[in-house]
Amino acid sequence: MYKICILGIYFGNLPSYFPLWLESCKYNSTVDFLIINDQNITDLPVNVRQVKMSFNDFRVLVQSKFDFPVSLERPYKICDFKPAFGLICSEYIQGYDFWG
């Protein structure tokens, strides 16, 4: 069976529907989920892992992957980097066949 990891990168207060999202993750037990954020999250399903870091730490991580200046001033601009998530999060997705 293939190993799959879904990345979720979100900074700030989590949306009100977040517990429902976690519940759906639980029922997709053949997929792992990685959440990178700055919140305290408890009671995670076994297939959900959290990497807690500040937005500034994430900016430093992103910049460390590129040899040119990166502009990431606000969390909502993280979506601009989705095509590079595999590179940015490479240390977290080692051993997976697919990531998204």
Language-model regions: role of each:
Residues 22-32:
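Short, acidic, metal-binding catalytic loop of nucleotide-sugar glycosyltransferases
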Residues 7-12, 35-38, 81:
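Short His-Asn-centered micro-motif
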Residues 95-100:
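Short beta-strand-to-loop acidic/aromatic patch adjacent to the donor-nucleotide binding site
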Residues 1-20:
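N-proximal low-complexity "stem/linker" segments adjacent to membrane-targeting elements
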Residues 19-22, 87-88:
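A generic local structural motif
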Residues 27, 92-93:
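Alpha-helix termination/capping residues and helix-transition junctions
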Residues 38-92:
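Active-site-proximal specificity loops/subdomain of glycosyltransferases
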